[in-house]
Amino acid sequence: MTDSIPKKPLKKGSLVFVDKENYIKSIEALASDNDLPNYVFEGPGEILSLKDEYAQVRWRRPVPDVWLKLDQLKEYTH
């Protein structure tokens, strides 16, 4: 038996930020600008939609929504 608390799944409406370590190691990072703005790592962004292993995230800034893999996102708790 483990004492770890199960991780809550991210869902539509969840507030999130990008986990920098997971993003930098991803294949998506190789295909994108490696100098992402700080706000994606600080959060919060809101999940608008989910499809398979991806989430559409809207940031609280006048920028386009982006699709990111769920394993690159963490729940924003501040």
Swiss-Prot record:
Catalytic reaction(s) noted: a plastoquinone + NADH + (n+1) H(+)(in) = a plastoquinol + NAD(+) + n H(+)(out); a plastoquinone + NADPH + (n+1) H(+)(in) = a plastoquinol + NADP(+) + n H(+)(out)
GO CC aspect terms: plasma membrane-derived thylakoid membrane
Membrane topology label: Peripheral membrane protein
EC number: 7.1.1.-
Function: NDH-1 shuttles electrons from an unknown electron donor, via FMN and iron-sulfur (Fe-S) centers, to quinones in the respiratory and/or the photosynthetic chain. The immediate electron acceptor for the enzyme in this species is believed to be plastoquinone. Couples the redox reaction to proton translocation, and thus conserves the redox energy in a proton gradient. Cyanobacterial NDH-1 also plays a role in inorganic carbon-concentration.
HAMAP family: NDH1_NDH1O
Protein name per its UniProtKB record: NAD(P)H-quinone oxidoreductase subunit O
Native source species: Prochlorococcus marinus (strain AS9601)
